[in-house]
Design a protein with these regions (language model features):
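Short histidine/acidic/glycine/proline-rich micro-motifs that form metal-
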Residues: 63, 128-132, 282
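Acidic, Ser/Thr-rich intrinsically disordered and amphipathic helical segments
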Residues: 67, 71-74, 106, 142, ...
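An alpha-helical support segment within catalytic cores of ATP-dependent transferases
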Residues: 68-89, 93-94, 98, 200-259, ...
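Generic alpha-helical structural context detector
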Residues: 77, 190-193, 217, 294-297, ...
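ATP-binding pocket architecture of kinase catalytic cores
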Residues: 96-235, 246-253
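Catalytic activation segment of kinase domains across protein kinase-like and atypical kinase folds
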Residues: 267-303
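Active-site activation/catalytic loop segments of kinase-like enzymes and analogous catalytic loops
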Residues: 290-334
Length: 334
């Protein structure tokens, strides 16, 4: 039975507005009161550079002044109606860009309730274009829906072709320094154990090695020959095979891993001291030891510095810190 996380909120939440799996580029078509698809003419694009290869370029400048696309307005009206709100006056909406997302663009959208207070909040996520090189968007959507149903992460409120509307989590995103805080680190360790024990659909097949090969092939296809030689891409193929052979054992504990537990994907409710893991683009079955090790590696990064692409390995956790984290993980009920 799936281990269900503790909900951060206990107020009424509307049912999810589902969408047809056939995400075509046609104009909005209603299949039922809660089933619709939306098209979007302009999509964000992915730029590449030698130093920071995944910088997003978005085309949603109109969101800032409140001029939302008509298709999105229809989604918000439908989501609002589930709360008993009437979202007709789009001029009353507050649209606030949120920073920190790497493969999407996210906005906080507020609208007044019947009492006239701006206290209804949702999160709008616009998918980035070109990220299919790194993960499968359909798999990510299915994972998000499953997590939402099991009380993990934000609740899914609505979907459209190039994005979705999510529950707004009233918690703060961690900072790079937070990962080194003893109390917060212990909370993260316990939450990881719970996450790994989730009973998720699909075969428990390790994705790590094939994903690395796919990423390597993608990197080779977009880099000039001199870069392939300079960065020794060919030797990386041999290294992946060597690691797979050395680290693939029957005794390894395979669980559903987040695979991207950097500080920006971890939220903390200061009142309840509850941890929420968000953004499941890379989530899959893998050895749980890999997810732990990857989290340690993320401690050397600061994506909000002037040089987000430079990793400071002097900040890698020492042996005692790693032992403490693993001990907390193992002692947690999950």
């Amino acid at each position: 039975m799936c281990q269900i996380g503790i909900r951060l909120f206990n107020w009424y939440e509307p049912p999810c507005v589902t969408v047809s799996q056939n995400l075509t580029r046609n104009p909005i078509r209603f299949y039922s009161r809660r089933s619709f698809i939306i098209s979007k003419e302009e999509k964000p694009k992915l730029c590449h550079s030698k130093l920071f290869p995944t910088k997003m370029v978005m085309k949603t400048n109109g969101f800032v002044d409140g001029s939302l696309p008509d298709e999105l307005k229809k989604v918000l009206r439908l989501v609002g109606s589930e709360w008993g709100d009437v979202v007709d006056d789009m001029e009353s909406l507050q649209v606030i860009p949120l920073k920190g997302a790497m493969t999407n663009e996210v906005f906080q959208i507020n609208w007044p309730t019947k009492c006239g207070n701006l206290d209804r909040k949702v999160l709008l996520r616009i998918y980035g274009e070109g990220v299919e090189a790194f993960f499968n968007r359909d798999d990510e959507i299915r994972t998000f829906e499953c997590m939402s149903k099991h009380g993990q992460g934000p609740r899914l409120l609505g979907r459209f072709a190039d994005g979705r509307v999510e529950e707004f989590i009233h918690a703060r995103t961690l900072s790079a320094a937070d990962l080194r805080d003893y109390e917060i680190s212990a909370l993260v360790a316990a939450k990881m154990r719970e996450f790994h024990n989730l009973e998720m659909p699909g075969p428990r097949t390790v994705l790590l090695w094939n994903r690395m090969r796919d990423w390597l092939a993608e990197a080779k296809s977009m880099c000039p020959a001199r870069c392939v030689k300079e960065f020794r891409f060919d030797s990386l193929e041999d290294e992946i095979s060597m690691l797979e052979k050395e680290l693939s054992h029957d005794y390894l504990d395979i669980g559903f891993c987040h695979n991207d537990l950097q500080y920006g994907n971890i939220m903390l409710d200061e009142k309840t001291r509850s941890i929420t893991l968000i953004d499941y683009e890379y989530a899959s079955f893998n050895p749980v030891a890999y997810d732990l090790a990857n989290h340690f590696c993320e401690m050397v990064a600061n994506y909000h510095s002037e040089t987000p692409h430079i990793l400071d390995y002097s900040k890698y956790p020492g042996l005692e810190e790693r032992r403490r984290f693993v001990a907390t993980y193992l002692s947690s009920a999950g």
